[in-house]
Curated annotation (Swiss-Prot):
GO terms for biological process: nucleobase-containing small molecule interconversion; pantothenate biosynthetic process; pyrimidine nucleotide metabolic process. GO terms for cellular component: cytosol. Keywords: ATP-binding, Cytoplasm, Kinase, Ligase, Multifunctional enzyme, Nucleotide-binding, Pantothenate biosynthesis, Transferase. CDD domains: CMPK. It comes from Parasynechococcus marenigrum (strain WH8102). ATP binds at residues 25-32, 144-147, 173, 181-184. This is Bifunctional pantoate ligase/cytidylate kinase. The keyword Metal-binding does not apply. Residues 1-264 are annotated as: Pantoate--beta-alanine ligase. Catalyzes the condensation of pantoate with beta-alanine in an ATP-dependent reaction via a pantoyl-adenylate intermediate. Catalyzes the transfer of a phosphate group from ATP to either CMP or dCMP to form CDP or dCDP and ADP, respectively. InterPro entries: Cyt_trans-like, Cytidylate_kin, Cytidylate_kinase_dom, P-loop_NTPase, Pantoate_ligase, Pantoate_ligase/cytidylate_kin, Pantoate_ligase_C, Rossmann-like_a/b/a_fold. The keyword Ligase applies. The lineage of its organism: Bacteria, Bacillati, Cyanobacteriota, Cyanophyceae, Synechococcales.
Amino acid sequence: MLSTQAELAAFHSGLGQPLQFVPTMGGLHQGHGELIRRAAEQGPVLVSVFVNPLQFAPGEDFERYPRSLEADLALADRYGAAALWTPTVQTIYPDGATADSARQAPAALQQHLCGADRPGHFDGVVTVVARLLELTRPAGLWLGEKDWQQLVILRQLVADLVLPVKIHGVATVREADGLALSSRNQYLSAAQRLQAAALPAALRAADGTTPLDVTRSRLSAAGLEVEYVERVDPQSLQPCGSETALSLLAAAVRCGTTRLIDHSFLMTRQPLVAIDGPAGAGKSTVTRAFAERLGLIYLDTGAMYRAVTWLVQQQGVEPGDAAAVDALLRALDLQLQSLPGGGQQVMVNGEDVSQAIRSPEVTGSVSVVAAHRCVRQALTTQQKAMGAKGGLVAEGRDIGSAVFPDADLKVFLTATVAERARRRALDLEQRGFPVQERSELEAQIAERDHLDSTREEAPLVQAIDAVELVTDGMSIDAVIDALVEQFRARVPEEAWPTPAG
């Protein structure tokens, strides 16, 4: 157990791996244990126990908040923590714990849910977490999705301060009857504990068409005092309706004097991810691996345009002849099949062309063929049909802007021309094709960029709400990790769990 800053510094200096940090206010339970267990898979884990006075308004339960240090130490050790740190108020707030000195959480993120009912609470949260991160300097920060509003606000804090820490959200851990684990559950009497189960039950009973008043009525009928029931966008935390593909249905109630919060995620379809970018940015490689990691179907739309280009060349049709290309489309049978390991088989009229479409000859003509309105309309229609139920990640040139403008996550993956030429040369060599001079490859890529971005029909463009990711100097694993981090900021583990293994 660590108490002083000197002990913390000595612990930090002896680490051989990046530190993983689990901040708590004590009263540890299995939910905290799951955070520790998951964090321990990445490196040594430091658990802090600090009951933050700035998170409590006058009249709240600061004085009686559960304090059970010996039990906390035993649980942290059982789940694999390397150390438990119990800083003093003086350590965290050397100038005093006053609301006047607190950081301000983003106003837009605390207009609703708990932020509206507990003014100043999230200011206290961001203040203490910023200080804890300053003192611990971890590589990973592990937080529960149970406190979803807090998780969103802390992600924004880390982004605003440009802190070198990766935030990991972990799904809510529940009792057998659905009640979310919470340190405050121990306030409940046996009768209240049975009554509290109505909270998760009412949330589970709701779907995208259930009026909020119905959920409120169900909670009230169970004898719970309702503070709020709201449906919000999980990222902006602003109210939304049933048209939103993924929304957060959240509630706060009082069971006796105990305040309980919970939520459920409502989905009208499975997650949809759009990854766009210029040729040679590494989209196919990372998108395949990203899709496999998250259990999503991989849709390589570029392969579809390459397949049409291959057919055009096989039939001896001039790539620039739109009418002749359109005639080929009428009899086209283009099928994509996901393969084990994240690959994709491409079939054109019953023939496997998965390798043939990667030839330099196809690469040289695909922009011309893809620019035809008839081609884009035919393939876009097929792509939209494939993505209607979600559950896939698609990569191409205009996925986020034209094909799936309602995607949960849009990424514009790019790299410099020089870096893309280097990657293209390596790819050609690995596939057994002749490799041109680097300068020639760079010229081809620059010309391809020009053609893709200036065509009339669905040009290459970064969607206004897309995240730009420049991958120069990044390993494939680093790019995939960055994509997963962006995905999890929008789609929680609770809504779309990461597949085991």
